[in-house]
Regions:
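N-terminal signal-anchor/first transmembrane alpha helix
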Residues: 1-41, 117, 195-196
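Hydrophobic alpha-helical transmembrane segments of membrane transport/permease proteins
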Residues: 19, 23, 27-63, 220-229
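Generic hydrophobic transmembrane alpha-helix motif, especially the helices
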Residues: 60-64, 95, 104-110, 114-166, ...
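Transmembrane alpha-helix signature in integral membrane proteins
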Residues: 70-105, 250
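Transmembrane alpha-helices
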Residues: 79-95, 184-215
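Non-cytoplasmic
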Residues: 131-132, 140-145, 149, 199-234
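Conserved small/polar residues in nucleotide/adenosyl-binding loops
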Residues: 244-251
C-alpha cells in the first residue's frame, strides 16, 4: 500500500467522523427547535401514557416507570448535553486562555502563584472535583457548566502558558520588544495567533470527556434538576428499577437507550 492509499484512507476516516458529528448536531438542532415550539409537552405527562409501555409506533423505545417516552427523552438529553458542554468549554477557555497568556509572558511571582493554583486543581481527579463543586453550587444547567469549567480550566491554562513561554523567546517577538511595541500588541498580535493552534485538539478531547462527567453528575443526582431530560439521571432511574425489581425486559429497555447515547 503506497502513501496515496494511506492518504485516501485518512481522508475517508475524517469524512466519516465529520458526518457523524454533523448528524448529532443536526439532531440537537431539530430537538431544540421542537422544544421551543412545545412539541414534547405531552411526553412529560404521567397520565396520558402507560407506564413501562413496550415499543410501539407511538413510543419507539417504550416508556419508563413515570410514563415518559424513553426515545424522546434520550434525544432531548442530547440537546442538554451539547448545551452544557458548550457553556463549560466556553467558560474554561475564557478563564484559562487569558491567564495562561499573562502567566507565560510575565512569569515571576505571578506565574508561580497561578501555576501552583492550577496545578493543585489539576491534581484532583476530574470526577471527584466536579462532584464537590456541583454539590456546593447546587443543581442547574449553569451550575453544572461552572463545575465543568473549574475542572477543565487548568488544562487550557497549562497548554497556553507552555506555548507562550516557547513563543515569547522567538526572534520575531524579541524584535517587536526591541522596536518598542507595547505589551498588548506583542501578546495579541505576535503571541496569541501562534499559541492557539493546539486548542482544537484539546477542545475535542474535553468535549467528549465533559459529556461523560455530566452524565456522572446526573447519575449521582448532582447535575440538572430531575424534571430536565438528562442521560445520567435517566440511567439512575433505570438502575433503581433493575436493583429493586426483577430485571425484566422492560427494565433493561429503559436503561438501554440512555446508555447507548
Amino acid at each position: 500500500m503506497d502513501i496515496n492509499s494511506f492518504n485516501r484512507v485518512g481522508a475517508n476516516i475524517r469524512k466519516a467522523g465529520f458526518l457523524i458529528v454533523l448528524f448529532y448536531l443536526l439532531v440537537v438542532l431539530i430537538m431544540k427547535f421542537l422544544e421551543a415550539n412545545n412539541f414534547f409537552g405531552y411526553s412529560f405527562s404521567m397520565l396520558s401514557n402507560d407506564i413501562f409501555a413496550p415499543p410501539s409506533l407511538n413510543h419507539f423505545c417504550g416508556t419508563d416507570r413515570l410514563g415518559r417516552d424513553v426515545c424522546l427523552r434520550t434525544l432531548q438529553g442530547s440537546s442538554l448535553a451539547i448545551e452544557v458542554v458548550f457553556l463549560a468549554i466556553l467558560f474554561s477557555l475564557s478563564l484559562g486562555l487569558p491567564l495562561g497568556l499573562l502567566s507565560g509572558y510575565f512569569g515571576g511571582f505571578f506565574d508561580k502563584c497561578l501555576s501552583l493554583i492550577m496545578d493543585t486543581i489539576f491534581s484532583i481527579p476530574v470526577i471527584l472535583l466536579s462532584v464537590v463543586v456541583a454539590f456546593v453550587l447546587g443543581k442547574g444547567i449553569l451550575n453544572a457548566a461552572l463545575a465543568l469549567c473549574i475542572v477543565y480550566s487548568p488544562q487550557y491554562f497549562r497548554l497556553i502558558r507552555n506555548q507562550t513561554i516557547l513563543v515569547k523567546s522567538e526572534t520575531y517577538v524579541e524584535a517587536a520588544q526591541v522596536s518598542g511595541a507595547d505589551v498588548k500588541t506583542i501578546i495579541f498580535k505576535y503571541i496569541l495567533p501562534n499559541v492557539i493552534t493546539p486548542l482544537p485538539i484539546l477542545l475535542t478531547l474535553n468535549a467528549a470527556d465533559a459529556v461523560l462527567v455530566l452524565g456522572s453528575l446526573g447519575f449521582l443526582g448532582l447535575g440538572v434538576p430531575a424534571d430536565v431530560p438528562e442521560w445520567g439521571s435517566d440511567l439512575n432511574l433505570a438502575l433503581a428499577c433493575l436493583l429493586y425489581t426483577s430485571p425484566s425486559p422492560r427494565d433493561k429497555r429503559q436503561s438501554r437507550m440512555p446508555s447507548s447515547a
